[in-house]
Amino acid sequence: MVGDRVVRLTADNPSPMTLEGTNSYLVFGREGALVIDPGPDDEPHLGGLIALAQTRGVPIRGIAVTHGHPDHAPGAAPLRARTGAPVYAHAGARFPHDVTLEDGDTIDRDDVQLRAFEAPGHADDHLVFWLQDDGALFTGDVVVGRGTVVIAPPRGDMRAYLATLHRLRDDFSAARAIYGGHGEPVTAPRDKLDEYIAHRLERERQLLAALATGERTIPELVTIVYCDVSRVLWPAAARQLLAYLIALEREHKVHARTLERELSPDERAILNPDLSAMVDPQSAAVAAAELGYDDPVDRIEVYGRR
C-alpha cells in the first residue's frame, strides 16, 4: 500500500528487467476503483487485485495500461473478463482494448479522474497517467523506482524518450510522487527526472568521446561506454547504444558503414544473445520485448564522427 487512495500490488515476476516485479496500482474512488497496469496474466496477481477492491467494498470499473510490454499488459484481457471493466490503452496498442486514449484524454469513472498523456521513448505505445488531485504521476516504464530503463529500437527512440522526460519535468511540476512500473515510489519527482536526463546526456557524451578517437562497432563501444556495468548487462547496453547511434546518424553527427563479414561469436553474444540460456521463459519474453529482439542485428556496422 502507498496511500489511502492509491494501493500498489507487485506481481510475482522478478527479473533483471522487472526488479522485484511489475507494479499494479488501484486508484480508489467512493464507488469503484481503476487498475493501472494489470501486469502479467497471472491468476494469483489478478485475484489479488480483485480481492483488494473487495476489501473496500467497490468493483473494478476500469483497467488502464501504460504500454504493451508482456510484464504490463497481458493481465488486461483476463481481468476484463472477470470484472467487466473496460480496458483503456494508447491508439497504437497491439493488444485488445475497449477505449483508445489520445494525449490529454480523461478516464472519468465515478469520482476518479485520470488523465492520459503520450510518453513515447521506451515504447511507441506508452502513456503516463496523471491523478491531479493527489499529485500522483503513474509512469510505467518511463521512470522506475530504482535504476534506469532500457531504450531499444525498433519501438524505443532515444530522442523521443528525452523529450518525454523533459515534458514530465516541466509540465508536471505539481507532482508529489511518481509511481513507476517497477520499484518503490519516487518522492522527489523533479530530482529524479533531472537525474534521468543528466544520465542520458552523459552516456551520449561518453559515446561521442569514444568515437572521437576513431571508428568503432557497437560491441567495441559497449566495452568503453559501459565499462562500469556488469558484462551480463552488455546486451542491453548495446541496444541502448544503437538507439543513440540511430538518433546521432539522423542528426548527421555520426556516420555508419556496413562491414562485409559475419558477426563473430563475441559480437553475436552481445548483439543477439540467447536469452533462453540466461533466464526463465517468462523473463526471456519480457527481455526480448524490452530489448527489441524481434528485430535482430544481422550485420556488423562501424560508426564514426562526422
Q: What residue spans do the PLM features occupy?
A:
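Active-site HxH/HxHxD metal-binding segment of metal-dependent hydrolases
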Residues: 20, 33, 40-115, 135
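Residue-level signal for inorganic ion chemistry
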Residues: 5, 49, 182, 207, ...
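Conserved beta-strand hairpin/beta-sheet module of binuclear metal-dependent hydrolase folds
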Residues: 1-56, 128-140, 145
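Histidine-centered divalent metal-coordination motifs
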Residues: 66-72, 122, 182, 244
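Short hydrophobic/aromatic-enriched beta-strand-loop microsegments
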Residues: 84-91, 138-140, 196, 231-233
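Residue-level signal for the nucleotide or nucleotide-sugar donor/cofactor binding architecture
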Residues: 74, 156, 236
